[in-house]
Amino acid sequence: MYLKTFLEKKMRTFEQYVEDLKKMKPNVYIGSEVVGRDDTRLEGGMNIIRETFDHVNEPEYEDLCTATSHLTGKKINRFCHIHQSEEDLLKKQKMTRVLCHRVGGCIQRCMGIDSLNALSIITYEMDQALGTEYYERFKKYLINFQDKDLVASCAQTDAKGDRLKRPHQQEDPDQYLRVIETRDDGIIVRGCKINITNTPYADEFIVIPCRYMGPEDNDYVVAFALPCDWEGVKLLTRPAYFRKSEFVDAPGLHMGDAETFIIFDDVFVPKDRIFLNGHGDPLQTPYAGFLALMFAHYHRFTYCGCKPAMSEILASAALLVAEYNGIEKASHVQEKISHIIGIAELVFAAGESSAKHSEKSPSGTQIPDEILTNAGRRLAGENIYEEYKILTDISGGLIATLPFEGSFFSEEVGPLAMKYLKRNPRVKPEYIYRCFRGIENMVVSDLGGLLQVAGVHGGGSPQMETITMMMRYDTEKLKDISKYLFGIKSKLRKYERPNVTPRKMLEKFGKAMKRKKKT
């Protein structure tokens, strides 16, 4: 009975999450202000995170939103779970899709667990190859993370400086986060991570490399986790949110986002929170690229859940405004909306297929197929502005020129404003107003603009997906098909593309070491 009660311990609530945030030290800079987590400009992002807590005990969502920890056997939030099977991957993808519907965009809690899944693979394989003890350290960290149902941010993207130079070649060595000292009790790091989502209202952030590191880049090979209010950490934050409404409330109006520069001003990281350190041990350097791409891989898999949701949100708005404009039956409208729906289904199918073609890593973590995740993410990124264009086309210019809310609820001009907003006679003017105001928020607001850029670059731009796909695809074997058909080769062996994962990055480092020895 005690064991059952222990395993069924109540999960963290949104209210507990908010109370924990309020206890954190103020280190969030909005402009020149230093603010705490109770600043109202951060509420929109917290409201999105709320959706990841509120549905774990609801029959409709529980199976998707919870999992059983492979380490403790406890029921945990799926945003804290390490994928152990194809089913886990599929449930994560479906969970992401349905929760994104509820918030009108990014659910903002995937980055942390995507980085933890990557670390569960890399730390184990490093230990096996180098005799390090990172995996046991990681498991202890993970158990605490799961027990407390923590929200994590992932800090991957560096400032990068001169884009044509490698980390060790930069004029300013701090343009990539680096270890400046390794001690018995930990390390000191200096640098900055940029374009980081949700950090001001996360419990912890997980730092990982943003790229492949060569033999000369040892100082930049580092991964660790810290609380978001850690000593020496400064969060330069740009919150995004919708204009508050005095007269018309709607769930979507309460959502928001925060993007951050995380500055590490000679920050001490305790030993038990370090998962990779090339400065202390150059033999660990090959694992920087492996980890960087493994996280990107999991995050692109996540995008195969969230981007279909985003497309469906845009298609939903396009269908509604077409009805309210009285043009829903027009063939050109049907054709345009079918394009959005088709992209949504194809991207989701790429994610599903990558889960179906997944493989188990030596640590037991399930890894989706890399080419399929990148194909899905690239398709989404290449089409996001086309989808917004379709919504804009069907909506008309009113989404950018709609008078302010007060005009529609003014005693003097309100009735006139509603009169001239009328379109489909079967639809109440208030609903038409809500529709156009909602699409205005989607397309021309601060947060709407952010989501459009995130649709291209979040998780990696289409160019990065292209590079990854071409690195992994065996193009020489692919040529054999044409060689046979054109009579250049007399035989054709059966061609089936094998499943691939980011493990190939280790081979890239090995080749770099051989080149270095020759010179």
Where do the protein language model's features map onto the residues?
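Short, charged, amphipathic alpha-helical segments
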Residues: Q334-S338, Q366-N374
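A structural signal for well-ordered alpha-helices, especially hydrophobic packing surfaces
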Residues: R50-F53, A322, A344, F348-G351, ...
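Acidic/polar, glycine-rich intrinsically disordered N-terminal extensions of enzymes
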Residues: F6-S69
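Glycine-rich flavin
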Residues: A67-E204, C210-F224, D229, K234
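Alpha-helix capping/hinge segments and adjacent helical runs
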Residues: I371-K514
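FAD-binding core of flavoproteins
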Residues: A159-Y303, Y473-A512
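Extended amphipathic alpha-helical segments enriched in small hydrophobics
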Residues: T302-K360
